[in-house]
């Protein structure tokens, strides 16, 4: 017998309301109603675990109730010695290492997932979980018809348990339907491999395109063009100077030739002077 504590229990809730609230989670051996809280006794430990996991925080008569396992009372000697674990039992690993595990651990989803298709709608997650337990395998989590109709997802603690359950359930006839099982174990290394590839490719994207890169030959040609530019300027200057010299030389040659000028008036006067003397008496 396993007892479960009910917190925030409405005062208007009756025994039938509580029994209806826990319907589908196994048989209840006793229901205890108090002022604002209560207790429920389950016959099976696994049914109590599932009820606490799924119904904690759900509404009962319009109020969200709290479901948890009551803590074990610690005696005076245990409290003095420090051996009161309050529901936690010590387990020992190889090598003598001690580890504390909660006896009432909640079902958890793991990466070892088994997908069961073609499941009858008459089978709930509790039914498929109990069916796997009858096969000698303990699942950690199960859900049915939640994501897809006629489909269940069951998780296990190890891949060996998953393989064992898959071999036993594959093709089994449940309520006129043959089950189809698929191993959907999540591999962490495979899920991370694309990220590593994308990271290795990222530096190439950040680099400049090859067209913008300059080869050593282009650098040399640029240097040659730059070094040749002063020569071109000097050639232009030399040509302009030669042209200016040729023009100036032509002008000087024209100025050296004596211009055709008329005789000066003095010479004309000298030629006319004897004529005037002979005519005088």
From Swiss-Prot:
<feature type="region of interest" description="Disordered">
    <location>
        <begin position="168"/>
        <end position="281"/>
    </location>
</feature>
<feature type="region of interest" description="Disordered">
    <location>
        <begin position="78"/>
        <end position="100"/>
    </location>
</feature>
<feature type="compositionally biased region" description="Basic residues">
    <location>
        <begin position="245"/>
        <end position="254"/>
    </location>
</feature>
<keyword id="KW-0217">Developmental protein</keyword>
<dbReference type="InterPro" id="IPR012677">
    <property type="entry name" value="Nucleotide-bd_a/b_plait_sf"/>
</dbReference>
<dbReference type="GO" id="GO:0007506">
    <property type="term" value="P:gonadal mesoderm development"/>
</dbReference>
<keyword id="KW-0508">mRNA splicing</keyword>
<dbReference type="GO" id="GO:0008406">
    <property type="term" value="P:gonad development"/>
</dbReference>
<dbReference type="GO" id="GO:0016607">
    <property type="term" value="C:nuclear speck"/>
</dbReference>
<keyword id="KW-0334">Gonadal differentiation</keyword>
<dbReference type="GO" id="GO:0000398">
    <property type="term" value="P:mRNA splicing, via spliceosome"/>
</dbReference>
<dbReference type="InterPro" id="IPR035979">
    <property type="entry name" value="RBD_domain_sf"/>
</dbReference>
<dbReference type="GO" id="GO:0040009">
    <property type="term" value="P:regulation of growth rate"/>
</dbReference>
<dbReference type="GO" id="GO:0005634">
    <property type="term" value="C:nucleus"/>
</dbReference>
<feature type="domain" description="RRM 1">
    <location>
        <begin position="2"/>
        <end position="72"/>
    </location>
</feature>
<feature type="compositionally biased region" description="Basic and acidic residues">
    <location>
        <begin position="216"/>
        <end position="225"/>
    </location>
</feature>
<keyword id="KW-0744">Spermatogenesis</keyword>
<dbReference type="GO" id="GO:0008380">
    <property type="term" value="P:RNA splicing"/>
</dbReference>
<protein>
    <recommendedName>
        <fullName>Probable splicing factor, arginine/serine-rich 2</fullName>
    </recommendedName>
</protein>
<keyword id="KW-0597">Phosphoprotein</keyword>
<comment type="function">
    <text>Plays a functionally redundant role in spermatogenesis and growth rate control. Required for the development of somatic gonad structures and for progression from larval stage to adulthood.</text>
</comment>
<feature type="compositionally biased region" description="Basic and acidic residues">
    <location>
        <begin position="168"/>
        <end position="190"/>
    </location>
</feature>
<keyword id="KW-0677">Repeat</keyword>
<keyword id="KW-0507">mRNA processing</keyword>
<dbReference type="GO" id="GO:0002119">
    <property type="term" value="P:nematode larval development"/>
</dbReference>
<feature type="domain" description="RRM 2">
    <location>
        <begin position="112"/>
        <end position="186"/>
    </location>
</feature>
<comment type="similarity">
    <text>Belongs to the splicing factor SR family.</text>
</comment>
<keyword id="KW-0694">RNA-binding</keyword>
<dbReference type="GO" id="GO:0030154">
    <property type="term" value="P:cell differentiation"/>
</dbReference>
<dbReference type="GO" id="GO:0003723">
    <property type="term" value="F:RNA binding"/>
</dbReference>
<dbReference type="GO" id="GO:0007283">
    <property type="term" value="P:spermatogenesis"/>
</dbReference>
<keyword id="KW-0221">Differentiation</keyword>
<dbReference type="Pfam" id="PF00076">
    <property type="entry name" value="RRM_1"/>
</dbReference>
<dbReference type="InterPro" id="IPR000504">
    <property type="entry name" value="RRM_dom"/>
</dbReference>
<feature type="compositionally biased region" description="Basic residues">
    <location>
        <begin position="191"/>
        <end position="215"/>
    </location>
</feature>
<keyword id="KW-0341">Growth regulation</keyword>
<feature type="compositionally biased region" description="Basic and acidic residues">
    <location>
        <begin position="78"/>
        <end position="97"/>
    </location>
</feature>
<dbReference type="InterPro" id="IPR050374">
    <property type="entry name" value="RRT5_SRSF_SR"/>
</dbReference>
<keyword id="KW-0539">Nucleus</keyword>
């Amino acid at each position: 017998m396993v007892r479960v504590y009910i917190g925030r229990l409405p005062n208007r809730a009756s025994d039938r309301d509580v029994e209806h609230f826990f319907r589908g989670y196994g048989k209840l051996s006793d229901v205890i109603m108090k002022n604002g809280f209560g207790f429920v006794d389950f016959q099976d430990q696994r049914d109590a675990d599932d009820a606490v996991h799924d119904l904690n925080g759900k509404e009962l008569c319009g109020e969200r109730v709290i479901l948890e396992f009551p803590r074990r009372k610690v005696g005076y000697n245990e409290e003095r010695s420090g051996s009161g674990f309050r529901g936690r039992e010590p387990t020992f690993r190889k090598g003598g290492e001690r580890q504390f595990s909660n006896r009432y651990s909640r079902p958890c989803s793991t990466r070892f997932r088994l997908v069961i298709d073609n499941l009858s709608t008459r089978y709930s997650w509790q039914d498929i979980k109990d069916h796997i337990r009858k096969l000698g395998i303990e699942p950690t989590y199960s859900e049915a018809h939640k994501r897809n109709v006629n489909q269940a997802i069951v998780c296990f603690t190890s891949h060996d348990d998953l393989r064992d359950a898959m071999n036993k359930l594959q093709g089994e006839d449940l309520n006129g339907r043959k089950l189809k099982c698929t191993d959907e174990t999540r591999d962490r290394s495979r899920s991370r491999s694309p990220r590593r590839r994308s990271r290795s490719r990222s530096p190439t994207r950040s680099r400049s395109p090859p067209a913008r890169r300059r080869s050593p030959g282009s650098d040399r040609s640029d240097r040659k063009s730059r070094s040749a530019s002063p020569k071109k300027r000097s050639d232009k200057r030399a040509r302009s100077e030669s042209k200016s010299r040729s023009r100036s030389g032509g002008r000087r040659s024209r100025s050296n030739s004596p211009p055709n000028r008329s005789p000066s008036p003095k010479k004309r006067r000298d030629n006319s002077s004897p004529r005037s003397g002979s005519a005088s008496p």
